[in-house]
Each structure stands twice: as structure tokens, then as C-alpha cells.
């Protein structure tokens, strides 16, 4: 028989006030206390919005308006649970049963995502690398991978390979922006020589000269095409559902994108690491050289590479930045947060919502919860 779990810690109002005075951000839900100090900078609504509610009951805020939080967001909150509030005056506790009853009326299909994470009883052993474990989850993988957690992930046993699977955000502009500048300078010089022509691989009679004035347009075309590629990869590759009986396809999905949905605030896994990125970028470059004349394909590629850099930087900012309310980035962040926590089958655009508009995959205005 398993031992009974230890009783929850309890805190008096004066103890909570001391922590608040020291700069901690504690909130409560009924009598349940949560320490959100480490989460405030990640809060989708902004740090100030959360700090303004320090010490308060957030039950009503979870239900909105202006925003009704998803079951995944409520489950995420439980990872910051620290104990119970004791010695509270009766008047301030009168509404607790009502608040708890309302917040628990979630869509039954979403109820499993509301469960608190028990690290010792989870489907995987978090003390070991996850990549070799997830393939055994089978039919449970899809539900498990879309239950986000607050802790970082380790994929590999080898420290070297593990290191290559992670990176800091600023490695992306440091490595790839100089390449964008070099390619742009090199191919513009080629255009300036006046020898660039289209269709030379098919005919010598009907070729079309490409003047250097076309360089900016081709570059911008590459950036625009990247936004479409970004959307298509995210929607059809990253969000494919691997067969439950395929150990290796589940592993592949997890290493490509599942890990990010499992640990959305693992800062070392938010942008594409340079080594695997080099392989993918190299394939794109070769494809452009095969399809188009060298200078034309290279220019489109350079624009696309800049689009990739902007995508990765935008993605990182959407997770860790605090855009001003009402700004485009604020709207984009809300769009992406809903993709992670409520609507994983929509909201595939990262750097722009353009293609979500075009293909009708915008995240709904309301989270996937039935209002009461």
C-alpha cells in the first residue's frame, strides 16, 4: 500500500504578507496558495497584470472577463502550488466553494489536462533523458505531450549531443545574419555585372535578363516565402500525429516539436540549434540552386534566411517578452499562447497570422472551455 502523501503546508495571512513584502508574487484560489514569482515574466498578459493581483484570490480572473483561462492554463497553475491559507476571516472565505465549483466545470474532453503533475508518478522518469522513453507511451503520447510543464527537458544521455540540441537565443542572429549579409552582397555584385538570365537551362533563344533592380524584390520574395514555409512546416510536419504503435516516429515527433509543447518555457530549446539548423538550411540552399539560376536562387534564399532569423527571434519573444497591450506583438503573443495551451490544432503562424487567415486556422477568440 502506497504511503499517504504528506499534508499540505499551511501559511497564515501574516506569513503570506511577509513573502509579498519581500517581493514574492503569491496568489490564491480559494484557500490554495500559489507562488508565481518565477512565472511572472512569462505571463502572457504581462508581468504587471500578475503582480497587481499578488495576495489576491484569482478565481474570478481565471474565468474572466476579459479572458477565460483554458484547462491547460489551470493545470499549469497547479505546478506552483505551495500550500493552504489558514486563519482567514470567515467573511473572505464565504465565496470559496462557489469559486471552486465554477472553475472545475470544464469540458470533460479537457479534464485530463487539468490534473496536477506528480513528477514521481508521471508516465516518464524525469530524472532520465526523455527521448528514449517517449516512444513507449504509445496511445498516451499525444495527450501527455500536450500537457505542458514548467521544468526543462533533457533529451540525450551524451552531454555532447545534449549540448548540440540546445542553444541560446542570440546564437541565431550571431551565426546567420552575417551569412545573410555576405550572400546579399555577393549576389548583388553578380546582378550588377548584367549577366543574370532566366530560363537558360531550358533554352538559349528565349532567355530573360534579370537586372540588378530586381534584387530587392527577389530578396523580399524569399522573406515572404519563408512565412509560408514556416506555416506549412509547423502545421503539417510539426503537428502530425505519429502512429501510436511507432516507437521511432513518436521519438522523431518529440525531438522535432513535441519537446517544445511539453516544456514551452525551456529557453534553451526555443530556437533552432545551429548544428541541425545548418543541415536543414543547406538543403534549402541546394534546392534553390537546382530550381533557379545561381544569383536568383541565392538571393531568394538569402531573403528566406532572414525570414527564418526573424521567425526564431519572434518566437523567442512571444514566449519571454512582454509586448504592450494593444500592439501587434501583443496580439501575436495571445495567438501563440492559445496555440500552446488551448488550441493546438490551430494558430500555426509564428511570425505572422497571415496564413492562418488564408487557411482558416486562426485560434478561436475564446479558449476551449464551456462557459457556465
Swiss-Prot record:
Alphabetically ordered keywords of this record: Disease variant, Endoplasmic reticulum, Fatty acid biosynthesis, Fatty acid metabolism, Heme, Hereditary spastic paraplegia, Iron, Leukodystrophy, Lipid biosynthesis, Lipid metabolism, Membrane, Metal-binding, Microsome, Neurodegeneration, Oxidoreductase, Sphingolipid metabolism, Transmembrane, Transmembrane helix, Zinc
Keyword Zinc among UniProt keywords: yes
Domain called Fatty acid hydroxylase: residue spans: 219-361
Subcellular locations according to the entry: Endoplasmic reticulum membrane; Microsome membrane
One example of a Gene Ontology biological process annotation: central nervous system myelin maintenance
Domain Cytochrome b5 heme-binding: 8-86
Top class in the EC scheme: oxidoreductase
Induction line: Up-regulated during keratinocyte differentiation.
Stored InterPro entries: Cyt_B5-like_heme/steroid-bd, Cyt_B5-like_heme/steroid_sf, Cyt_B5_heme-BS, Fatty_acid_hydroxylase, Scs7
Pathway named in the protein's UniProt entry: Lipid metabolism; fatty acid metabolism; Sphingolipid metabolism; galactosylceramide biosynthesis
MF terms in GO: 4-hydroxysphinganine ceramide fatty acyl 2-hydroxylase activity; fatty acid 2-hydroxylase activity; free fatty acid 2-hydroxylase activity; heme binding; iron ion binding
Residues where Zn(2+) 1 binds: 234, 239, 257, 261, 339
Domain notes: The histidine box domains may contain the active site and/or be involved in metal ion binding. The N-terminal cytochrome b5 heme-binding domain is essential for catalytic activity.
Annotated family: Belongs to the sterol desaturase family. SCS7 subfamily.
Medical condition linked: Spastic paraplegia 35, autosomal recessive, with or without neurodegeneration: A form of spastic paraplegia, a neurodegenerative disorder characterized by a slow, gradual, progressive weakness and spasticity of the lower limbs. Rate of progression and the severity of symptoms are quite variable. Initial symptoms may include difficulty with balance, weakness and stiffness in the legs, muscle spasms, and dragging the toes when walking. In some forms of the disorder, bladder symptoms (such as incontinence) may appear, or the weakness and stiffness may spread to other parts of the body.
Matching PANTHER family: FATTY ACID 2-HYDROXYLASE, FATTY ACID HYDROXYLASE
Protein name, as recorded: Fatty acid 2-hydroxylase
Amino acid at each position: 500500500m502506497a504511503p499517504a502523501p504528506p499534508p499540505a503546508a499551511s501559511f497564515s495571512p501574516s506569513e503570506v504578507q511577509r513573502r509579498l513584502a519581500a517581493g514574492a508574487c503569491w496568489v490564491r484560489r480559494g484557500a490554495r496558495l500559489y507562488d508565481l514569482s518565477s512565472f511572472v515574466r512569462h505571463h502572457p498578459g504581462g508581468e504587471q497584470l500578475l503582480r497587481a493581483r499578488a495576495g489576491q484570490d484569482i478565481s474570478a480572473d481565471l474565468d474572466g472577463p476579459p479572458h477565460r483561462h483554458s484547462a491547460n492554463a489551470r493545470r499549469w497553475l497547479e505546478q506552483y502550488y505551495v500550500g493552504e491559507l489558514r486563519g482567514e476571516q470567515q467573511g473572505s472565505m464565504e465565496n470559496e466553494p462557489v469559486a471552486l465549483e465554477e472553475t472545475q466545470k470544464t469540458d470533460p474532453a479537457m479534464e485530463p489536462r487539468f490534473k496536477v503533475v506528480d513528477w514521481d508518478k508521471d508516465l516518464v522518469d524525469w530524472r532520465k533523458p526523455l527521448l528514449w522513453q517517449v516512444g513507449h507511451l504509445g496511445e498516451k503520447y499525444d495527450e501527455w505531450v500536450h500537457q505542458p510543464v514548467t521544468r526543462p527537458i533533457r533529451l540525450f544521455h551524451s552531454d555532447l549531443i545534449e549540448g548540440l540540441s540546445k542553444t541560446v537565443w542570440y546564437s541565431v542572429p550571431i551565426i546567420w545574419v552575417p551569412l545573410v549579409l555576405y550572400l546579399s552582397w555577393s549576389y548583388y555584385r553578380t546582378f550588377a555585372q548584367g549577366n543574370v538570365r532566366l530560363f537558360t537551362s531550358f533554352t538559349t533563344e528565349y532567355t530573360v535578363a534579370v537586372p540588378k533592380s530586381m534584387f530587392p524584390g527577389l530578396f523580399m520574395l524569399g522573406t515572404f516565402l519563408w512565412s509560408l514555409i514556416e506555416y506549412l512546416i509547423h502545421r503539417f510536419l510539426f503537428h502530425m500525429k505519429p502512429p501510436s504503435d511507432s516507437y521511432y516516429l513518436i521519438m522523431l515527433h518529440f525531438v522535432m516539436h513535441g519537446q517544445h509543447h511539453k516544456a514551452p518555457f525551456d529557453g534553451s530549446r526555443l530556437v533552432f540549434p545551429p548544428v541541425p539548423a545548418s543541415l536543414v538550411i543547406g538543403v534549402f540552399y541546394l534546392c534553390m540552386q537546382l530550381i533557379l539560376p545561381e544569383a536568383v536562387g541565392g538571393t531568394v534564399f538569402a531573403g528566406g534566411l532572414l525570414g527564418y532569423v526573424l521567425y526564431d527571434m519572434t518566437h523567442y519573444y512571444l514566449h519571454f517578452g512582454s509586448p504592450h497591450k494593444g500592439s501587434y506583438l501583443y496580439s501575436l503573443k495571445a495567438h501563440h499562447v492559445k496555440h500552446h495551451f488551448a488550441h493546438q490544432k490551430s494558430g500555426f503562424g509564428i511570425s505572422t497570422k497571415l496564413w492562418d487567415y488564408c487557411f482558416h486556422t486562426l485560434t478561436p477568440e475564446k479558449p476551449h472551455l464551456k462557459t457556465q
